[in-house]
From Swiss-Prot:
It comes from the Bacteria. It is an enzyme of class 4 (lyase). Belongs to the phosphatidylserine decarboxylase family. PSD-A subfamily. The modification Pyruvic acid (Ser) is found at S182. Keywords: Cell membrane, Decarboxylase, Lipid biosynthesis, Lipid metabolism, Lyase, Membrane, Phospholipid biosynthesis, Phospholipid metabolism, Pyruvate, Zymogen. The gene is psd. The keyword Hydrolase does not apply. It holds the Pfam family PS_Dcarbxylase. Pathway: Phospholipid metabolism; phosphatidylethanolamine biosynthesis; phosphatidylethanolamine from CDP-diacylglycerol: step 2/2. This is Phosphatidylserine decarboxylase proenzyme. Its EC number is 4.1.1.65. One of its GO terms (biological process) is phosphatidylethanolamine biosynthetic process. Heterodimer of a large membrane-associated beta subunit and a small pyruvoyl-containing alpha subunit.
């Protein structure tokens, strides 16, 4: 499947344009000696908003990682968005990770719900319940419920979600973006088998988080 998005996220285009204009102006006025920090800033901004295509595993019961980052939680927890006990797997994204979110499974969206909140460090547990967040609840064709929650962080204060209830999602499909690092919680049915461990580095779409019970 071709990735239907530019490798530099559209969300970053205005920032890249501003950084490029500033670097060009400083270079024109003072030469490279004055402008090199701004060229370096431009390189950082471009790198920050990269959004590369990733291979998608073919395994039908696989739950794919929704974001790049590091695993900070694998535990049984209450899923308040689907009102159930669930296996919760949390991915923390730092400022150097890719910041787009991609669907963990194929399915139909049953609910999208936004919650205002605080902006605590997204790596800590209480960020899941106290920070600003946006939950997407997905029903698979086999009747399984998978909840993916975008969570704002200490620096990240803008959650973007591009899907609505009733729409279909394909695994690996890009559905959201959070600027400047944050967290994504995934809630899965009890009986799902986690395939990652705390501290592990993971990649959106290409890392298998868990396997749904068949």
């Amino acid at each position: 499947m071709n990735y239907p998005h530019p490798i530099i996220a559209r969300e970053g285009w205005p920032f890249i344009a501003i950084a490029a204009v500033i670097a060009l102006l400083i270079h024109a006025i003072g030469g490279f000696g004055f402008a090199w920090p701004f060229w370096l800033l431009l390189v950082f901004v471009v790198q920050f908003f990269r959004d590369p295509q990733r291979p998608i595993p073919a395994q039908p019961n696989a739950v794919l990682c929704p974001a790049d980052g590091r695993i900070v939680a694998v535990e049984t927890s209450h899923d308040p968005y689907a009102n159930r006990e669930a296996l919760k797997i949390s991915v923390f994204m730092n400022v150097f990770n890719v910041h787009s979110q991609r669907s963990p499974v194929d399915g139909a969206i049953s609910k999208v719900e936004y919650f205002p909140g605080a902006f605590l460090n997204a790596a800590i547990d209480k960020a899941s319940t106290e920070n600003e967040r946006n939950a997407v609840v997905i029903q698979t064709a086999s009747g399984k419920t998978v909840t993916a929650v975008q969570i704002a962080g200490l620096i990240a204060r803008r959650i973007l979600c591009y899907v609505r209830a009733g729409e279909p999602l394909s695994r690996g499909q890009r559905y959201g973006f959070i600027r400047f690092g944050s967290r994504v919680d995934v809630y899965l049915p009890l009986g799902s088998r986690a395939k990652v461990s705390i501290g592990e580095k993971v990649y959106a779409s290409s890392t298998i988080l868990a396997e749904l019970e068949q």
